[in-house]
Swiss-Prot record:
GO terms for biological process: poly(3-hydroxyalkanoate) biosynthetic process; poly-hydroxybutyrate biosynthetic process. It comes from Ectopseudomonas oleovorans. This is Poly(3-hydroxyalkanoate) polymerase 2. P.oleovorans accumulates poly(3-hydroxyalkanoates) after growth on medium chain length hydrocarbons. Large amounts of this polyester are synthesized when cells are grown under nitrogen-limiting conditions. When nitrogen is resupplied in the medium, the accumulated PHA is degraded. It is an enzyme of class 2 (transferase). It comes from the Bacteria.
Length: 560
């Protein structure tokens, strides 16, 4: 694998919406308040507004005369059809849209708004401009062609899809054909057994898929916001099967999908439940110090467990930790507090406690509005304008299979983003013990995504710096989920690595080397060096203390 200098990768993420905003929620009143603020600025500074209106008028005049001063992003698939550039009507319509988009962006950028209000205005007008894109109308050339080719049936199917989504999907277009998948059938289908269950989780032990296995097991901690089978999708995308085929012992946590009865489950509850799963893993494997892997909020829970064990002088029960797109340092370089203030945070806590849970569908909606062109308008065109069935992608099915968060954990996560407690010793207390991550002297391997809009890579990088021990950091050229599900064989995949961790993410990036392909083989080399000798695997799952309770994927994952 040839190393190349890292080039063309942004030094900082460009998003202003992230996981903090997703769990906080997005209220209509906040958007209306932003619109009012923009209107006030327009009235207070009429010369500024007039300047941009004149500029817009001049550009529209050039468009009417047939000039094409603006070009869409060549990577924007919305306008890839040749009709947008070859047909005079469509070309002028696209140019007018691009001119409007440019001037609204410049008006906001050059306004007297402060940084936070400017970020809110950009977010609001990005939503508006994305919605107003001419590709979202029935005049979309692809929709017109499909209408004629189908004899009008595409419109009939599109209206049927729209009515169904209004009734059954909260008015958002479906992203996936759910009929194509079944949990335990063609998803989460790797053979194994539930070997431990408590009120919050089930522990799955997988059957070996190699002639020999390493002695030290790996315990995987998925995020609580979604279900565990992000690690066990279809066979070609299954991280679990990749690990098993390469000789690793794998245990998997499957979190229970809580309901209002479980509103008091907080971070300490999850850490305590995870510690019980760790004990079961140690007992069944006969190994005193398993390796751990955590993703997103699962990584936060895993770090809290390690800090808890360290405070009890029991950190020897863990050998190493792998963090996948996990935030431990919740400070963002971009304006992360987009619509977050003390009043909004407390209102979000009260709302979820009254309901008992934060509905996963609500979180999914916010995530969708973070990337509306990819996650909303793309499917608007496909499902409604073209009248097509949404695609059958395993990752999209998993994404739609959302879970709830208990109110107490929701409140703990909001406080985590508000207070950033892990950046100083004893800033966070879990299960009655203060947490100091610098004292967690374990080998760690951290993965972030350069295009991650949920957990920005520079914040994940700073999170790695909070840990003690020997640390590795890898930056994949993917988004949040694709940074985890990164199987070998993707010709577009690459990652950046630099063994020297600087205090500044930009400095690390400047000296990082680019390697083609997936980061999985690099991590496999790292983890196998910490997984003990190879030995013949046991033929039976569980043991006398923890007998099998049922086949994988268990029962908790099936709860909607």
């Amino acid at each position: 694998m040839k190393d190349k200098p890292a080039k063309g990768t942004p030094t900082l993420p460009a998003t202003s919406m992230n996981v903090q905003n997703a769990i906080l929620g997005l209220r209509g009143r906040d958007l209306i308040s932003t619109l009012r603020n923009v209107s006030r600025q327009s009235l207070r500074h009429p010369l500024h507004t007039a300047h941009h209106l004149l500029a817009l008028g001049g550009q529209l005049g050039r468009v009417i005369l047939g000039d094409t001063p603006l070009q869409p992003n060549p990577r924007d698939p919305r306008f890839s059809d040749p009709t947008w550039s070859q047909n005079p009507f469509y070309r002028r319509g696209l140019q007018a849209y691009l001119a409007w988009q440019k001037q609204t962006r410049l008006w906001i950028e050059e306004s007297h708004l402060d940084d936070d209000d400017r970020a809110r205005a950009h977010f609001l007008f990005n939503l508006i401009n994305d919605a107003l894109a001419p590709s979202n109308s029935l005049l979309n050339p692809l929709a017109v062609k499909e209408l004629f080719n189908s004899g009008g049936q595409s419109l009939v199917r599109g209206v049927a899809h729209l009515l169904d989504d209004l009734r059954h999907n909260d008015g958002l277009p479906r992203q996936v054909d759910e009929r194509a998948f079944e949990v335990g059938g063609n998803l989460a289908a790797t053979a194994g057994a539930v070997v431990f269950r408590n009120e919050l989780l089930e522990l799955i032990q997988y059957k070996p898929m190699s002639e020999k296995q390493h002695a030290r097991p790996l315990l995987v901690v998925p995020p609580q916001i979604n279900k565990f089978y992000i690690f066990d999708l279809s066979s070609t995308n299954s991280f679990v099967q990749y690990m098993l085929k390469n000789g690793l012992q794998v245990f998997m946590v499957s979190w229970r999908n809580p309901d209002p009865r479980h509103r008091e489950w907080g971070l300490s509850s999850y850490v305590q439940a995870l510690e019980e799963a760790l004990n079961a893993c140690r007992s069944i494997s006969g190994n005193r110090d398993p390796n751990l892997m955590g993703a997103c909020a699962g990584g936060l829970t895993m770090a809290a467990l390690q800090g808890h064990l360290q405070a009890k002088h029991q950190l020897r029960r863990v050998r190493s930790a792998t963090y996948l797109v996990s935030l431990l340092d919740s400070k963002f370089e971009s304006p992360a507090s987009l619509f977050a203030d003390e009043q909004t945070i407390e209102a979000a806590k009260r709302r979820s406690y009254q309901r008992g849970v934060l509905d996963g569908a609500e979180v999914a909606r916010i995530f969708a509005w973070m990337r509306p062109n990819d996650l909303i308008w793309n499917y608007w065109v496909n499902n409604y304008l073209l009248g097509k069935t949404p695609p059958a992608f395993d990752i999209l099915y998993w994404n739609a299979d959302s879970t709830r968060l208990p109110a107490a954990l929701h409140g703990d996560l909001l406080d985590f983003f508000k207070l950033n407690p892990l950046t100083h010793p004893a800033g966070l207390e879990v299960c009655g013990t203060p947490i100091d991550l610098q004292k967690v002297e374990l080998d760690s391997f951290t993965v972030a995504g350069s295009n991650d809009h949920i957990t920005p890579w520079d914040a994940v990088y700073r999170s790695a710096l909070l840990l003690g021990g020997d640390r590795r950091f890898v930056l994949a050229n993917s988004g949040h989920i694709q940074s985890i599900i990164n199987p070998p064989g993707n010709p577009k995949a690459y990652y950046l690595a630099n063994p020297k961790l600087s205090s500044d993410p930009r400095a690390w990036l400047h000296d990082a080397k680019r390697s083609e392909g997936s980061w999985w083989p690099l991590w496999l080399e790292w983890i196998t060096a910490r997984s003990g000798p190879l030995k013949a695997p046991r033929s039976e799952l569980g043991n006398a203390t923890y007998p099998p309770l049922g086949p994988a994927p268990g029962t908790y994952v099936l709860t909607r």
